[in-house]
Amino acid sequence: MKLDDLLGEYYELEQQLADPAVHADQAQARTLAKRYSQLTPIVATYRELNRVESDIETAQELAAEDPSFADEAKQLAAQREELVQRLRTLLIPRDPNDDKDVILEVKAGEGGEESALFASDLVRMYLRYAERQGWKTEIISATHSDLGGYKDITIAIKNRGTVEPGQGVWHRLKFEGGVHRVQRVPVTESQGRIHTSAVGVLVLPEAEEIEVEINESDLRIDVYRSSGPGGQSVNTTDSAVRITHLPTGIVVSCQNEKSQLQNKEQALRVLRARLLAEAQAAAEAEAAAERRSQVRTVDRSERVRTYNFPENRISDHRVGYKAYNLDQVLDGELDGVIQALVDADTKERLEAAQQ
């Protein structure tokens, strides 16, 4: 969308939000306010750019009579370039999911018990990062291994309050999907040999009910008895729920809640996120067939990152990021690697927008 169109949309939204009648429909008012907040940084930067350009003209006129104003004109010109670059960045087409909450799934892969133990390390890393960001977290379902690791776990991570541009859960975590590889000496290794294991991470934008309609007739719902670590029975009732979405074959299970109804609601929540992700992936694939892809898509089956314990090194293979602070990263200090991924994505989006 062109800048003039965005400015027109902003001023129209400003008028709509000033109308008390609009706020009678709270859902509509929230939608309008959200869009207004997205456009506000663009308009503010545009206004600042206009002010600086006006100041440049004045400084140049004064410099023609008094050379002492030449330095001020140069400083203003540099400021204008910064504002132009900022405006270009703000005009990059946004990921429509950037303000969404996230469903994050971590699954042990090759490596057996060691993989499950590393899965628990990754879960702790994401929970600590969420805590640092002030996000809310909720464990939806989990299956433990014999040594207390995770065979699989599903977590909801939610924004808290108003989402600042570039700080939303999806915006920060969307590149975490893929295969995470660990190189270390497992606790089960008696001879001190380094093993390589892998854990799969899937990150989905959480879907609202109005975004994904699920027909009960498309579901097969099975109930069974919940189990804990090592197959221990969690309770004596059939409260665990497994939902199969027949049209797609997607299967979601949940056993963490005490009641069958609660487990069903949580499973449906995960199912909605998976269906939304599948629909968006299909739409992106269709669009890519008609035009060159404007943004890189991450193959969630590829190896994206390696955690090397002997060297205290973390490497992200997509952007060539490397740092020797693995202990800090696993304690939730993820901003370095995440920002490298966000910056690479922003650069590609900017280049695509200029084509």
Swiss-Prot record:
<comment type="function">
    <text>Peptide chain release factor 1 directs the termination of translation in response to the peptide chain termination codons UAG and UAA.</text>
</comment>
<dbReference type="InterPro" id="IPR004373">
    <property type="entry name" value="RF-1"/>
</dbReference>
<keyword id="KW-0488">Methylation</keyword>
<protein>
    <recommendedName>
        <fullName>Peptide chain release factor 1</fullName>
    </recommendedName>
</protein>
<dbReference type="GO" id="GO:0005737">
    <property type="term" value="C:cytoplasm"/>
</dbReference>
<keyword id="KW-0648">Protein biosynthesis</keyword>
<dbReference type="GO" id="GO:0016149">
    <property type="term" value="F:translation release factor activity, codon specific"/>
</dbReference>
<feature type="modified residue" description="N5-methylglutamine">
    <location>
        <position position="232"/>
    </location>
</feature>
<keyword id="KW-0963">Cytoplasm</keyword>
<dbReference type="Pfam" id="PF00472">
    <property type="entry name" value="RF-1"/>
</dbReference>
<comment type="similarity">
    <text>Belongs to the prokaryotic/mitochondrial release factor family.</text>
</comment>
<dbReference type="InterPro" id="IPR000352">
    <property type="entry name" value="Pep_chain_release_fac_I"/>
</dbReference>
<dbReference type="InterPro" id="IPR005139">
    <property type="entry name" value="PCRF"/>
</dbReference>
<dbReference type="Pfam" id="PF03462">
    <property type="entry name" value="PCRF"/>
</dbReference>
<dbReference type="InterPro" id="IPR045853">
    <property type="entry name" value="Pep_chain_release_fac_I_sf"/>
</dbReference>
<dbReference type="InterPro" id="IPR050057">
    <property type="entry name" value="Prokaryotic/Mito_RF"/>
</dbReference>
